[in-house]
Amino acid sequence: PAAQDEFRVQVTATTYPVYALACAVSAGVEGVSVSRLNTGQVSCLHDYTLTVSDMARLEQADLVLINGAGLEAFLDGVLDQLDAPLGDCSVGIDLLEADGQLHSHGEDGEIGHSHDHDPHYWMDPRNAAVMADTIAQALSQADPDNAGRYQANASLAAEALTNAYAAWTTSLSGLSYPYLITFHDGFRYFAHAFDLELLFAMEEEDGATASAKDILTASNLVKQYHLPAVFMEVNGSGSAARAVAGETGSAVSTLTMLMDGADAPNEAGAVDILTQLYLSPMEQNIKTLMEVLK
């Protein structure tokens, strides 16, 4: 598009959480555009294939920001060919080990995840604050004249994230049922952040259905802990969750992994953007837990 000429710095983010934080950190800086790959429609990025428009966004970028930690397997072989510098948002994050014991994959015989670490670290707001700082550093290198603005925005974002985390921790500290059973394996950092015990996590990927054994395991845990609800991810299939609910009488509630969301509003400040794109959906998760696990 001709409009791209207006931008001095074109930033491409590979995932929605990286996009959300990059928009907040670059708020108010003229001539910076942040776009994202079209990864929002899948619950699990292992099912994702690059589109032609994605490829164009990557090739036109002056800076490419990735989640890292093994999440972007779909970019293997692509990133090396790009001219743009790469900002890896997982740098400086205390990553959890990928724990094969905790999550189970559908029975298509293929285990798609071979990460050494769990890459879903943005689900802990404290990690999102680290991401904001990493993004500010990457933007400052791409656009040194505005380094002060990026750092100031990252500081504002970190403060808002820290305050939200403190409030949410207090809200969740009194749950009668501080336990999660999730039908997506991306909630470990979230559980860890808020001192919830993730009893069982399983993921139904494209073409794979939950095994009878997994449904039985989850159902037994629901009964053992008297859980009022199990949780599916907003983009996930939900069939296994419904099977467990049918077996146990528990409810099925929905949580978001923030894989998709609204575009950043124009002319908004760092905290407003962060609130709309990250804090509000995360707050919805907190409210859901307070409603169903109280």
At which residue positions do the language-model features occur?
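Extracytoplasmic metal-acquisition and chelation regions
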Residues: 1-294
